[in-house]
């Protein structure tokens, strides 16, 4: 197997999963955290900056109440209460491992999808780093609802890496890396030392999660890697239960899987549109419109739209797809200039007919190319 070196970096986000923070559902434990802390301390001594994204608040809350066991199947109020109980315990646990100030940063999905709040979070983390403080980030489960949750800290870590302008994302889990198949089921499965691009083939390799407390599985790790690499951030998946892997990482070696940054990273605004802004609906377009979006850098015109789905307003994000032989493929995502009701009236029509149908024409396009992110 080819040797892969860890790319040079100056600022990293290190994500630590529940399986490492609270192994065997016993609440917070240092069993797997000492090597991670050693990596963070060593990196800081080398003049590098590190941000931690730590799961484990709900698991800590369960253990504090003497319940332990799986954290699955909890209602939203139960999860919120247990997170409120466990988050201080989680922070205290981390503080014992470091001799530098640690700052708690709790984020919600709303903080990530609203651009102004995204920038506020970015500025807060930048200020903490300037003050030589170790930011420790978690999702604010105490106020998050099912509809407004990131849902897993793999993807949260990717969002944090983007807003913090990190150049490395390290996902510490209980797996050795990405395999060609589930190694528990397939003895011929091989670990991939590096992934150059995250394609449908890569997603096909991903198996389901079997974690008890954790909400993420291998799929969420690949999703997180895609978010990060799309913005030019190298991403590493390592086994945090094997202390030697973290020590190797500290030496610049690559014991897990490296997801290499995209050759052409997305600009900040388009990355936010694609990965953070929720889609409120979907527009299906004809093959000609799809080709124009993909290959000509065109705006989406009403003439190319064949179907409108969802209830959305002007300024909302919508997915744009093309259907061929019964299969629907996403082409792009963008911010629409027209709501769903108006689009149902003007779909398939030429731009000059918009005013005739609606009595007004705010724009002669539905999605401007500057507000459009085309899928690779």
Curated annotation (Swiss-Prot):
Protein name, per record: Glutamate 5-kinase
Record's function text: Catalyzes the transfer of a phosphate group to glutamate to form L-glutamate 5-phosphate.
Domain of life (superkingdom): Bacteria
Keyword Cytoplasm on entry: yes
Taxonomic source organism: Salinibacter ruber (strain DSM 13855 / M31)
Family per record: Belongs to the glutamate 5-kinase family.
Reactions catalysed, as given in the entry: L-glutamate + ATP = L-glutamyl 5-phosphate + ADP
Keyword Transport on entry: no
EC number: 2.7.2.11
Sequence positions that bind substrate: 55, 141, 153
Keywords of the record: Amino-acid biosynthesis, ATP-binding, Cytoplasm, Kinase, Nucleotide-binding, Proline biosynthesis, Transferase
Domain PUA: 280-361
InterPro entries reported in the protein's UniProt record: AceGlu_kinase-like_sf, Asp/Glu/Uridylate_kinase, G5K_ProB, Glu/AcGlu_kinase, Glu_5kinase, Glu_5kinase/COase_Synthase, PUA, PUA-like_sf
NCBIfam families: proB
Chain positions recorded as ATP binding sites: 15, 173-174, 215-221
Subcellular location: Cytoplasm
Lineage of origin: Bacteria, Pseudomonadati, Rhodothermota, Rhodothermia, Rhodothermales
Functional pathway: Amino-acid biosynthesis; L-proline biosynthesis; L-glutamate 5-semialdehyde from L-glutamate: step 1/2
GO molecular function list: ATP binding; glutamate 5-kinase activity; RNA binding
Main location: cytoplasm
Protein's GO biological process: L-proline biosynthetic process
GO cellular component entries: cytosol
